[in-house]
Design a protein with these regions (language model features):
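Helix-to-loop junction immediately C-terminal to a conserved catalytic motif
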Residues: 7
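Conserved ABC transporter NBD signature motif
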Residues: 15-22, 34-35
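Conserved ABC ATPase "signature" region
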Residues: 69-101, 150-152
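Conserved ABC ATPase signature
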Residues: 105-109
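Walker B catalytic motif
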Residues: 134-135
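Helical segment within the ABC ATPase nucleotide-binding domain
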Residues: 144-158
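H-loop/switch region of ABC-family ATPase nucleotide-binding domains
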Residues: 166-167
């Protein structure tokens, strides 16, 4: 319920939700993305028929290619932007040790690999706060360790803040 309130999926009966000194109580969930507030879910969601790299490249919003006039009259701008997004996606797969899977269809990934991909999507927009909902659910011990290491590195090296719901106390500890 708390995550649903913060993420704009539920309306509070009283009080306010404040993020970065801004009242976001009535902000639709799709607008929170641009403010740097992201949420993951217990069951990872991905574009199953796209590769890991393509899934990451889908994340950044307001791309120049989304505007018809740019598509018609500024193809070089779109190509340049796409190259920058691809470079960032490559950095993310490397950071998460998913380079060997960058061309794999996301639908073929294991549950733990999908959770790493989901974490990678938060990296594509430099989230300020990531709400992790049972990030360890259904993940084997090996990938759970990788996931924990990635979360810790994102916090220490890149300044990400995480709020986590998790039942696996060994993972949290």
């Amino acid at each position: 319920t708390l995550f649903n309130l913060i993420a704009g999926n539920l309306k509070s009966s009283s009080g306010n939700v404040v993020f970065n000194n801004e009242n976001i109580t009535d902000t639709p969930s799709y607008e929170l993305f641009s403010k740097g507030l992201l949420r993951t879910f217990q069951i990872a969601h991905e574009f199953t028929n796209l590769s890991v790299l393509e899934n990451l490249m889908m994340v950044p919003g307001n791309q120049s290619g989304e505007k018809l006039m740019n598509a018609l009259f500024k193809p070089s701008l779109i190509a340049k932007e796409e190259n920058l997004i691809k470079e960032k996606a490559m950095e993310v797969v490397k950071f998460l040790n998913l380079s060997h899977l960058k061309n794999e269809l996301a639908g073929n990934l294991s549950g733990g690999q999908k959770k790493l991909l989901e974490l990678g999507r938060t990296m594509m927009v430099d989230a300020k706060l990531v709400l992790l909902d049972e990030v360890g659910a259904g993940v084997n011990r090996t990938l759970l360790k990788d996931l924990g290491t990635a979360i810790e590195k994102l916090n220490k090296e890149k300044g990400y803040t995480f709020c986590m719901i998790e039942h696996d106390m060994d993972f949290i500890g």
